[in-house]
Regions:
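N-terminal glutamine amidotransferase
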Residues: 1-131, 136
Length: 138
């Protein structure tokens, strides 16, 4: 007689999640277009805003950050033409911290130009020591 075993991982995780999503591409001439497709696939994770930062060796960093859905913002070929290069990272946002009214400064990825080069960063989750880090770094 066989006995049925319960599944090792129950199937109770079938709902959409309200979390951010990150997607990156490296080594493709139009990396930002691939990132836009990846963000579209992750759209259910973040529905408030999205952003893409790309880097081109000859043009440096370029970014686009917008409120709303990926399909409404990153399908415009004129906008995507402003995001050249073989490196790109994107983020879709679902806020769990910060103010209730969305502000563009909270839309990721973040990037900065420094004396030794630039950097772009996107993260998921809350930075629990954000206030202390802000005081220390700024």
């Amino acid at each position: 007689m066989s006995r049925q075993m319960p599944p090792a991982h129950p199937f109770d995780d079938d709902k959409l999640k309200e979390e951010c999503g990150i997607y990156g591409v490296i080594g493709v001439a139009d990396a930002a277009n691939f990132v836009a497709l990846g963000l579209h696939a992750l759209q259910h994770r973040g529905q408030e805003a999205g952003g893409i930062v790309c880097h081109h060796p000859d043009h440096g960093f370029n970014n686009a950050r917008r409120f709303g859905y990926v399909r409404d913002n990153f399908t415009d070929q004129n906008l995507m033409a402003t995001l050249p290069g073989p490196l790109a990272i994107g983020h879709v946002r679902y806020s769990t911290a910060g103010g209730k009214a969305p502000v563009i400064r909270d839309v990721q990825p973040f990037f900065g130009e420094f004396s030794m080069g630039g950097a772009a960063v996107a993260h998921n989750g809350n930075i629990t020591n954000a206030d202390a880090l802000r005081r220390e770094l700024i």
